[in-house]
């Protein structure tokens, strides 16, 4: 029975269909211009860029230029790349220009499609970023598509690992910049740790097109980019805690795979308490006393490391390091580390060198980084299942772009077996049958461990010539995946490894030329060999087509339908035939976690025998229902995390904007005066509360504050004895004295040096306090969840307390800055050590018995204003001190070493 909604869609079409229809009409208008542009010479076509830029300067909009700009880019692509964007690619290009996400099937030409909106938006000269998932794709696309942009007079840069700041600055200054999401995000964080605007590498965030947008904005949304610095080494402690976990019995802990949590039971808590007590690490009477918060945190991390994280699935051990594996792509993520001690717990578990824990210096999530762009769009093969999330969080509408040719892939129903062993036997049988008839096969697995187990089975069964593509062999990824379409090829791949590289039936011409002709120079011989490779690929393609096209065989369903759809989408590109099938067992993670017990009972009642599978559309629907539940739960988690991160993000914006303002300021006198006055007001109100009786005044405390925060000695005791004096008069007198001292210092330093000193002190203090604030916010976030048990909203509690922490940080900033500026003095560099005659230091005056060594030096350097004899130093005037050795007693008379007194502020 057709629902009313279904009936309406049949009559009127879906909103997606109606939108595509409108855009198709615009695409036809662009195609109508094609003849005119074909008749232009190269020079006339190239001149269009200057023509469009002049029109923009006169006030025309990008939208008004779109038809002609797209027609120009299409004609340039035909001439430079030998490729003509189809009308569906024009439609996709318009979606990208209009802040949308273009869902385009694998092999339909997303990379070429992106050149149209990239060219149009680059005309403004504000910078366009094309974001990809790895350095290989960024470099490949920048080189290939760069030829098109260069032909049209635009500059192209690429951001990749290993570039220095000058190279990065040059790449960002280009009209078009290709780079990975990680590199762009880290450059933003590093820029906001710089002290001069000239040192920064990025321009303001104008327009970004994110390739594989679902991977970056959904799968990686929960992973923050963190720049951190090392703390003290605590490897012995991690190793000790790790020894407590292996002896535990199942009754000692509970693991919830659905929620991905592991906790100690009451029995387990008692056991580890005894172990900690024996090791001398238990403070107080109970493990959960406040003094043991850090110990509990490390114990929980050790339990998670052992019971939730699996080697070769979640991470691998390589070169004495734990390398995280991306759960969505199966790729290694070198350089990425779990935070808050979890990575160290994994290192202890695997007995590799434990790296020191890190303190966060700066962090941002991809969600908040990409929301900074004035205009954002994306493209992928699979986004429709996450359309709600893209709309809610990023304000991006997903549009499914029709394929240029009808899809001929056959998606078969899942085969469900009772055990993993039965499932793998069926997979091997199916691979053998397809391999023998010459059909190329892509086998999708969910982890490195499972891909290698399957490879071992194929070896035992005598199936040869297969390739394993997983995080261990990341370097060969593109080549292996490009050749997966050769007849009879068997490629075992973890999840979406090789994403971004097409699987072309018969093989990939570009890859084969690169591999086979790398040492053959340009010329007739090379052309002849390329022609031979083309003919060979065409012949192999015919064989692959005759065998049924690419067969995607999946060994397990993923939690997300989108990941399954990505795998399916590798087959049937550009109208080619193909097929896909999922092999499942009731022992698979998804089935086991989401209620396979009922299904197992049902299959037993049906009398399912060993090695028999059940195949029915109902099972597919039941699995999709389970996946939808997981997706909805993950969306809620990401949405909730974003609400918390938005609190920090608002504070981050304020701090980073303040830093930028500081960089641009040429005179900070007023800013510093305001800070100084606020510090004085806070100081006075604390010690002399408004309307309080004189007996309640803390004059001794006020005097101490003035000395420690303002470096002044004021007669506040005398002022307090005056008749009728109130807190306002105290404030005014202290401000007047502090302003006078600051003005004298500014006159001594000169305006240029004073501004430099003020800027340095403010920015360094701001950075240090911001780092401490990030740690405080992390701690607050880790405990605020428990407020829910007291019927209080954890998010509101977090917002309130995070704001209070922020206010405290700003108050501390004022105090630290003013305290340092009131003490700072310029000390000129000491001259080179004087060359003294031998034994000069032992020459003692026979009359007085004093060593005249010091006097000899002063005599020799009496015209050098950097060295002042101790006798001529005025303790109250640092200007008379000259160069003071750091280990010398401080000339102020405090009794401390210089480096611990006035020298601390140099």
UniProtKB/Swiss-Prot annotation:
SMART domains: SecA_DEAD, SecA_PP_bind. Its EC number is 7.4.2.8. One of its GO terms (cellular component) is plasma membrane. The keyword Cell membrane applies. Transmembrane segments: none annotated. InterPro entries: Helicase_ATP-bd, Helicase_C-like, P-loop_NTPase, SEC_C_motif, SecA, SecA_CS, SecA_DEAD, SecA_motor_DEAD. Residues 868-887 are annotated as: Disordered. Its cofactor is Zn(2+). This is Protein translocase subunit SecA. It comes from Brucella abortus (strain 2308).
């Amino acid at each position: 029975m057709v629902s009313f909604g279904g009936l309406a869609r049949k009559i009127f079409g879906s909103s997606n269909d109606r939108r595509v229809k409108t855009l198709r009409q615009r695409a036809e208008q662009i195609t109508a211009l094609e003849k005119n542009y074909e008749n232009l010479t190269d020079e006339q076509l190239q001149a269009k860029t200057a023509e469009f830029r002049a029109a923009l300067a006169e006030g025309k909009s990008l939208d008004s230029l779109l038809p002609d700009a797209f027609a120009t880019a299409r004609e340039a692509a035909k001439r430079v790349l030998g490729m003509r964007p189809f009308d569906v690619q024009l439609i996709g290009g318009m979606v990208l220009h209009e802040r949308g996400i273009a869902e385009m099937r694998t092999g339909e030409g997303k990379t070429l499609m992106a050149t149209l909106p990239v060219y149009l938006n680059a005309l403004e000269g504000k910078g366009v970023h094309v974001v990809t998932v790895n350095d290989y794709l960024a470099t490949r696309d920048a080189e290939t598509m760069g030829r098109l942009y260069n032909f049209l007079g635009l500059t192209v840069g690429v951001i990749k690992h290993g570039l220095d700041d000058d190279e990065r600055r040059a790449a960002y200054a280009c009209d078009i910049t290709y780079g990975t999401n990680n590199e762009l995000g880290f450059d933003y964080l590093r820029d906001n740790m710089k002290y001069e605007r000239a040192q920064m590498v990025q321009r303001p965030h104008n327009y970004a097109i994110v390739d594989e947008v679902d991977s970056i904005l959904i799968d990686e949304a929960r992973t923050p980019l963190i720049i951190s610095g090392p703390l003290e080494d605590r490897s012995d402690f991690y190793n000790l805690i790790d020894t407590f976990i292996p002896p535990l019995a199942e009754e000692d802990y509970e693991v919830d795979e659905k929620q991905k949590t592991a906790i100690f039971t009451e029995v387990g808590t008692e056991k580890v308490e005894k172990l900690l007590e024996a090791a001398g690490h238990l403070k107080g009477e109970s493990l959960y006393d406040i003094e043991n918060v850090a110990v509990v945190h490390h114990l929980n991390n050790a339990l998670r490391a052992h019971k939730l994280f699996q080697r070769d699935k979640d991470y691998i051990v390589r070169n004495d390091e734990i390398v995280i594996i991306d759960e969505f792509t199966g790729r290694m993520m070198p350089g990425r580390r779990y935070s808050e001690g979890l990575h160290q717990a994994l290192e202890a578990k695997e007995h590799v060198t434990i790296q020191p824990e890190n303190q966060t210096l700066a962090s941002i999530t991809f969600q908040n980084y990409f929301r900074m762009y004035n205009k954002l769009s994306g493209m992928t093969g699979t986004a429709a299942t996450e359309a709600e999330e893209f709309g809610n969080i990023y304000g991006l509408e997903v549009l499914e772009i029709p394929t240029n040719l009808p899809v001929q892939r056959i998606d078969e129903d899942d085969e469900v077996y009772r055990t993993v062993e039965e499932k793998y036997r069926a997979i091997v049988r199916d691979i053998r049958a397809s391999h023998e008839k010459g059909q190329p096969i892509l086998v999708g697995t969910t982890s490195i461990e499972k891909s290698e187990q399957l490879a071992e089975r194929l070896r035992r069964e005598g199936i040869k010539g297969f390739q394993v593509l997983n995080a261990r062999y990341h370097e060969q990824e593109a080549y292996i995946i490009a050749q997966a379409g050769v007849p009879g090829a068997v490629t075992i791949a973890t999840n979406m490894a090789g994403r971004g590289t097409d699987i072309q039936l018969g093989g990939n011409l570009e890859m084969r030329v690169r591999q086979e002709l790398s040492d053959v120079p340009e010329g007739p011989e090379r052309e002849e060999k390329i022609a031979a490779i083309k003919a060979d690929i065409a012949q192999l393609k015919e064989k692959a087509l005759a065998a049924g096209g690419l067969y995607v065989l999946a060994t397990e369903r993923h939690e997300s339908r989108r990941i399954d759809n990505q795998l399916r989408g590798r087959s049937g590109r550009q109208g080619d035939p193909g097929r896909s099938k999922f092999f499942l067992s009731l022992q698979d993670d998804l089935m086991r976690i989401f209620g396979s017990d009922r299904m197992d009972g049902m299959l037993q009642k049906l009398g399912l025998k060993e090695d028999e599978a059940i195949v029915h559309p109902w099972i597919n629907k039941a699995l999709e229902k389970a996946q939808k539940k997981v997706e909805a739960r993950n969306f809620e988690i990401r949405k909730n995390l974003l609400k918390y991160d938005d609190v920090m993000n608002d504070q981050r914006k304020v701090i980073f904007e303040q830093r930028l303002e500081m960089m641009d300021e040429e005179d900070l006198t007023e800013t510093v005066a305001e800070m100084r006055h606020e510090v004085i007001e806070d100081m006075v109100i604390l010690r002399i509360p408004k309307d309080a009786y004189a007996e309640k005044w803390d004059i001794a405390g006020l005097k101490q504050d003035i000395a420690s925060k303002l470096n002044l000695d004021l007669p506040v005791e005398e002022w307090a004895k005056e008749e009728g004096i109130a807190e306002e008069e105290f404030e005014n007198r202290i401000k007047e004295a502090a302003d006078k001292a600051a003005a004298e210092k500014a006159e001594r330093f000169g305006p240029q040096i004073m501004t430099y000193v003020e800027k340095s002190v403010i920015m360094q203090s701001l950075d240090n306090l911001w780092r401490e604030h990030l740690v405080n916010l992390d701690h607050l976030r880790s405990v605020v969840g428990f407020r829910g048990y007291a019927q209080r909203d954890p998010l509101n509690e977090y917002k309130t307390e995070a704001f209070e922490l922020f206010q405290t940080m700003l108050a501390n900033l004022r105090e630290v800055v003013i305290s340092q500026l009131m003490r700072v003095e310029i000390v000129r560099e000491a001259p080179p050590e004087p060359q003294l005659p031998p034994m000069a230091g032992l020459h003692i005056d026979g009359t007085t018995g004093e060593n005249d060594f010091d006097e000899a030096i002063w005599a020799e350097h009496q015209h050098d204003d950097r060295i002042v004899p101790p006798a001529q130093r005025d303790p109250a005037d640092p200007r008379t001190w000259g160069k003071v050795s750091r280990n010398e007693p401080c000339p102020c008379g405090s009794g401390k070493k210089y480096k611990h007194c006035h020298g601390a502020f140099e």
